[in-house]
């Protein structure tokens, strides 16, 4: 009965939408839900409701623990970039997202395996499929069946709610604002799965899919839809043409503000937040949400400051233009230029080169939030050269061959031409580069890297 019910809802969602409008399919995907379940059970994930249900159950035994470990050791994410696009303006294609898409679209795990051939090595794909097959029964017994009645009622009411709110109108608003494009014959698929946790929901979007966990007691559908639209707006931004991306990057480069590069990096999240959590929420709820829109101070603050300008452009059916970008950068400079000295902001977009691989874990633990992160545990001329061409915060940590490595760094940046340093003393040095990003050089002996950084920058 479950599969028939879900299929009917999915079809009714499509057939009530005209051919001229974007199509939205809503579905439950058991293979995807099992994938998320196993993923959340791995040791790299913090405590969660899936782990609570699994721990102490009949399936909490060596056989399944071994499968969880094997799943965690699989390499599922490979990427290919779009080098003709400005750095950071278009997300790379990631194979783990293609795998998730296939889990949503497949009719069975065997179908998933056939759809996914060539995305990852066959041995890994076969093992992944076998692990998901082994965990289908535990997932149903521990998660789906105990929450089945609540979830299926939620699914029906959510489907009706989505239809009543004309989601396609918000989608078109995003297309116009971002000056992006979408072929309306391609459906946007929304996959929902139950989450036995009352503390909130998660959402993500990729390609033509949005995925959201639904807490079994969730009834704030306005909040849920606004968060899902936030994720969908990311995809609309990602699908801007190369011409639009280059125009936007040129507008940032033409602006003389020292804040322009970091404003560019904040753009994607700030715009999705002001559109989804601000504009869409107000349209659904009738009033602007007075609580935080995003659980990160830089994104939240900028989104709220941008709200009047964004609503002005939406009301005028205007797309982002150079005047909008200049006004956005001015908001950053007038209100938030101090962020250029805050580590939590600077290290959100980071390229780290070090001669000590342990620094990766240390920085990841202390500064976990990143929108762009590159890391290399060898200091070489080729790596420094690559770093100089990447317009993000550049952090170089030297702990070993001090004289040679410091000399290499000095010769790689024109801004360091007159730099004087003492290689036998511990120090942290920083300077603003011509690409309007911070270069941070740490010559470390015994002091922890986080302590050295915090002595120079705000946290």
Language model: regions and residue ranges:
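Active-site recognition of the HExxH zinc-binding catalytic motif
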Residues: 222-243
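Long, well-structured alpha-helical subdomains associated
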Residues: 258-344
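Long, folded non-catalytic interaction modules
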Residues: 344-459
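Active-site scaffold of zinc-dependent metalloenzymes
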Residues: 112-118, 171-172, 189-222, 434-456
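Bacterial Sec-dependent N-terminal signal peptides
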Residues: 1-23
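N-terminal mature-domain "stem" immediately C-terminal to a signal peptide or N-terminal signal-anchor/transmembrane
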Residues: 20-106, 300-303, 349-358, 372-374, ...
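Auxiliary, metal-adjacent structural segments of Zn-dependent hydrolase domains
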Residues: 147-204, 375-401
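Post-HEXXH active-site segment of zinc metalloproteases
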Residues: 239-264
């Amino acid at each position: 009965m479950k599969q028939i019910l879900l299929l009917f809802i999915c079809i009714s969602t499509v057939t009530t939408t005209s051919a001229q409008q974007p199509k939205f399919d809503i579905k439950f995907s058991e293979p995807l839900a099992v994938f998320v379940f196993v993923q959340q059970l791995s040791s790299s994930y913090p405590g969660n409701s899936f782990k609570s249900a699994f721990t102490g159950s009949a399936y909490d035994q060596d056989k399944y623990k071994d499968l969880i470990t094997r799943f965690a050791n699989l390499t599922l994410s490979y990427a290919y970039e779009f080098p003709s696009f400005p750095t950071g303006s278009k997300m790379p294609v990631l194979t783990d997202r293609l795998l998730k898409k296939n889990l949503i679209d497949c009719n069975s795990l065997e179908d998933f395996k056939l759809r996914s051939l060539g995305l990852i090595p066959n041995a890994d794909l076969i093992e992944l499929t076998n692990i998901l097959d082994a965990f289908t029964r535990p997932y149903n017994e521990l998660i789906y069946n105990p929450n089945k009645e609540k979830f299926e009622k939620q699914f029906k009411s959510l489907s009706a709610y989505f239809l009543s709110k004309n989601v396609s109108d918000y989608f078109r608003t995003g297309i116009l604002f971002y000056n992006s494009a979408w072929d309306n014959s391609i459906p946007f698929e929304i996959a929902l799965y139950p989450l036995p946790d009352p503390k909130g929901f998660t959402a993500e979007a990729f390609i033509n899919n949005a995925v959201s966990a639904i807490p079994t007691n969730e009834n704030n559908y306005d909040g849920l839809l606004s968060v899902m639209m936030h994720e969908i707006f990311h995809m609309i931004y990602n699908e801007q043409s190369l011409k639009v991306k280059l125009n936007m990057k040129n507008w940032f480069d033409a602006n003389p503000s020292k804040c322009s590069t970091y404003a560019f990096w904040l753009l994607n999240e700030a715009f999705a937040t002001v559109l989804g959590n601000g504009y869409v929420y107000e349209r659904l709820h009738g009033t602007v949400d007075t609580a935080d829109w995003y659980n990160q101070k830089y994104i939240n603050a900028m989104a709220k400051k941008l709200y009047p300008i964004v609503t002005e452009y939406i009301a005028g059916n205007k797309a982002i233009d150079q005047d909008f970008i200049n006004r956005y950068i001015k908001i950053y400079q007038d209100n938030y230029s101090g962020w250029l000295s805050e580590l939590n902001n600077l290290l959100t977009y980071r390229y780290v080169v070090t001669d000590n691989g342990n620094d990766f874990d240390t920085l990841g633990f202390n500064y976990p939030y990143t929108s762009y992160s590159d890391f290399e545990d060898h200091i070489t001329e080729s790596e420094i050269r690559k770093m100089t061409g990447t317009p993000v915060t550049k952090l170089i940590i030297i702990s070993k061959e001090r004289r040679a490595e410091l000399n290499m760094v000095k010769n790689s940046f024109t801004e360091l031409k007159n730099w004087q340093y003492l290689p036998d003393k511990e120090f942290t040095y920083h300077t603003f580069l011509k690409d309007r990003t911070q270069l941070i050089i740490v010559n470390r002996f015994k002091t922890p890297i986080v302590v050295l950084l915090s002595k120079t920058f705000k946290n």
